[in-house]
A protein has these predicted regions:
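Short, low-complexity Ser/Thr-rich regulatory SLiMs
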Residues: 69-72, 133-135
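Compositionally biased P/S/T/G-rich terminal and signal peptide-adjacent segments
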Residues: 2-12, 49-71
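Extracytoplasmic
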Residues: 20, 61-65, 73-75, 116, ...
C-alpha cells in the first residue's frame, strides 16, 4: 500500500471501483474463487491469503500473472504483472495513458533507480491505483523488467 496523500487532498477526477475482476471488496477467498472460476478466469492456485490467476484481462490487455490479496476483512487489493527480458516502458506508457484518461493526473510520479517509474492515483475514499515499472532479478538470477498494476483500498 502506498503512502496516502494528506487528508485535505482531493482528486481532480476519480472513477471509484467496488470490485476487482467482478469480485467485490470484502469478499472471502472461497467465494472469490468460485466467482472467478464461474466467470472463466484461470485460477492457478491459492494460499496465504492470496489467489493466483494466469492470463487475466485488465484495461484491454492480457496480464500473464495476477494476484488477489485478502485479510480477515476479505478482498482488499490486487496486482497484475507483466515482464519482459529487455527494457521497454511500452506497456507502462499504454497503461499510464489509459489511467490518465479515466482518473486524471496521478497524485505522484516517482523516478526509480535504473530508469524505473512509479505513478500513484488516490481516490477520496482511500482507494488507490499504483503503476510501477522497473528491473529486478528473478530467482534464477536473470534480469527482467516488470510492469505492475495494483488496485486496492
Amino acid at each position: 500500500r502506498p503512502t496516502p496523500p494528506p487528508p485535505a487532498w482531493r482528486p481532480h477526477a476519480w472513477r471509484p471501483f467496488h470490485s476487482i475482476l467482478g469480485v467485490a471488496f470484502g469478499t472471502a477467498v472461497n467465494i472469490s474463487i468460485n466467482a472467478l472460476l464461474n466467470s472463466g478466469y484461470d485460477v492457478s492456485g491459492y494460499g496465504d491469503n492470496v489467489v493466483y490467476l494466469s492470463n487475466v484481462p485488465m484495461l484491454s490487455m492480457s496480464w500473464p500473472v495476477a494476484n488477489l490479496y485478502y485479510s480477515n476483512g476479505g478482498l482488499y487489493g490486487s496486482e497484475f504483472v507483466y515482464s519482459t527480458s529487455r527494457y521497454s516502458m511500452s506497456r507502462y506508457n499504454t497503461v499510464y495513458n489509459s489511467l490518465l484518461g479515466v482518473n486524471g493526473a496521478p497524485y505522484s510520479v516517482q523516478s526509480l533507480a535504473g530508469g524505473g517509474r512509479r505513478a500513484t492515483w488516490w481516490g477520496n475514499d482511500g482507494q488507490y491505483i499504483t503503476l510501477n515499472f522497473g528491473g529486478d532479478y528473478t530467482t534464477g538470477g536473470g534480469l527482467r523488467y516488470f510492469t505492475t498494476l495494483s488496485f486496492g483500498r
